[in-house]
Amino acid sequence: MKMIIDGKKVDSLSGETFDVINPATGKVIESVPKATAEDIELAVTAAVKGQKEWAKTSVTQRADILHRFVEIVEQNKEMLAQTLCAENGKPITEARAEIGNISIAFPAFAEHAKHFYGTLIPQGTEAGQETTLQLVTREPIGVVACIIPFNFPCDLYDQKVAPALMMGNAAIVLPSSDNPLTLMKLTDNRKLNIAIIIYQISQKSWCTRQLSIHTCCFGNCKVERHCGLWICSRNGNG
């Protein structure tokens, strides 16, 4: 399989790959690209550009796209469940349930975003503002790095990617290198314009450090303790 950067299926610029192993059989399922710092730079650059266009779409348009995404997931849910079972090692019943959660979570975030209103502050609430009506609106952060742990990859994908997209952000998806295949298949959706928004990079610990230089929001800083400490130390040093 290949990574997806700027809506295109690509290999690593280094040409390096690593194997995804079935934990039950010890056999290789698939080989995936091993991302380099240069690959991440390309993904970040494309995400910044794509986010500006994505942010121009209305909340209802974004919701429609996510609902179409769910329809395609439903059409391929058994294939996705079998992939998740093979690469993750969880029983097929649990894999099917986790894939089924996509059709619950994505619509839920899509519909919630439609009612995520701004705030109106009446006149006189603050001293000196007796005649001023203040309106607080919500704006996208920009690019969100969605770091996905190995244990519930699809559930965490739902909880990070769906709200990020619905609020007008771009999302760079960084799956666990133990089991990236299901998320790569989810992201490889050629029928949707969503491909310009989500980017797939095969995860290694240093990828987190590289991304932290650029992105202003992390979906999860607990993927690896030393990476979390590195991010904190960097923030502390300005």
Predicted regions located by residue number:
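Rossmann-like NAD(P) dinucleotide-binding subdomain of oxidoreductase/dehydrogenase enzymes
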Residues: 118-238
